Amino acid sequence: MMLKQIVALSGPRCCGKSTIAQHLVVNHGYIRIAFADALREIAETAGPDFANDRLYLARLGDKLRSQVPDFLIQAVKNRLELTHGPVVIEDIRFPAEIEFCQSIGATTIRLEIPIETQRERLAKRDGKEEHESELLIACMDEHALDDVIDWDYRIPAIGDFRELALAIHTGISQSNITQANIQDRRKNTKSSKGGESI
């Protein structure tokens, strides 16, 4: 088990995971790691446009996971071993990824937004037409964690993301969370909806 403060974020596309992670990096000294980093590196070999094409990355991730299920987990694990200080993993999308994050004592956070807000943010962020946005929302990774109940925290991803990042950082720092009591709390919340609010 790794002995460092790790925050692991999950949520649908455009819920603010990357923005909140960036605030944690800039304002609170976290180191950012993403499961998708390895995908971007692979996609970049096909050309720089592919590394930023979210639909292409989602499909590449699906294909890669079907052939080498723990490839992205191993890539994150290797990066974690090289980092010192607090870490934010910004993109949990699959059950194996949340299980990995929980196994290393990460504080898991599910960001939630209404689907209408997600559609609006996708159109604004990516300039996607409605059809393209629906393809992104329909990707396998978009709903893989919908039924997970044992998040440490569930947070509505609305409002000022800088304030949400501060609440996450402050809530975790002030709660004096240790890896042992995270595991205990997870055992005690398995039967509930899961997750506290910060």
Region annotations inferred by a language model:
Residues 9:
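Hydrophobic anchor at the beta1->P-loop junction of P-loop NTPases
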Residues 31-87, 93-96:
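ATP-dependent small-molecule kinase phosphotransfer cores
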Residues 17:
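Conserved lysine of the Walker
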